[in-house]
């Protein structure tokens, strides 16, 4: 089943469901990016029963596949990629078959990056200081792009539900992130906004009702 939403669609109260474990299903997000990215926050909620590694967010350009990539390596262990560099976060609050509210921040000025899971934050780390992400981005949910818009590996695919995806060109304040963790949005993402999302899907991707807040 495929969706091709050229006009912006409000997905409030909805989830993308990816039920199969292969390299075919994914969601392509069309972002409002018209200048280099020098800081960012990406937030999403996901629910998965997998224990193996899986890709949560992939942004590639024609010059680099892992410009921005978030990978859940195992329960409580997450790997972030920025400008082809990577680092791991360990012992994060996590779960199987339950909703995880996640935010990831990065600021190129300092290189500081941080993860938030269910209201608790990691220690700040440094990756790719003074880096800049330029070029037309390809943003995918559900798969890791090893090439621009493709090169998917089924062993890195996401299986489960994902919702409330927002992407900003700044580092959100801790208070704004805590609002998100509790199901509220002070200001929707200016690069990707779940309440006005342009997207296309491939393979078995379904839009279902969310049970995050009932």
Regions found by a protein language model. Give the residues of each.
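Extracellular glycan-associated modules
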Residues: 1-214
């Amino acid at each position: 089943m495929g969706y091709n939403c050229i006009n912006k669609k409000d997905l409030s109260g909805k989830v993308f469901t990816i039920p199969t474990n292969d390299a075919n299903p994914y969601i392509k997000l069309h972002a409002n990016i018209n200048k280099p990215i020098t800081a960012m926050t990406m937030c999403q909620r996901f629910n998965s029963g997998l224990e193996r590694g899986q890709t949560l967010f992939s942004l590639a350009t024609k010059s680099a596949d892992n410009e921005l990539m978030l990978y859940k390596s195992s329960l409580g262990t997450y790997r972030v990629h920025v400008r082809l560099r990577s680092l791991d976060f360990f012992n994060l609050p996590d779960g199987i078959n339950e909703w995880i509210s996640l935010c990831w921040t990065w600021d190129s000025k300092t290189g500081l990056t941080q993860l938030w899971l269910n209201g608790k934050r990691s220690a700040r780390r440094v990756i790719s200081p003074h880096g800049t992400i330029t070029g037309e981005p390809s943003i995918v949910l559900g798969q890791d792009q090893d090439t621009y818009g493709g090169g998917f590996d089924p062993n890195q695919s996401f299986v489960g539900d994902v919702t409330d995806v927002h992407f900003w060109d700044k580092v959100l304040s801790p208070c704004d992130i805590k609002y998100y963790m509790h199901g509220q949005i002070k200001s929707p993402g200016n690069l990707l906004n779940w309440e006005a999302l342009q997207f296309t899907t491939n393979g078995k991707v379904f839009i279902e009702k969310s049970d995050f807040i009932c």
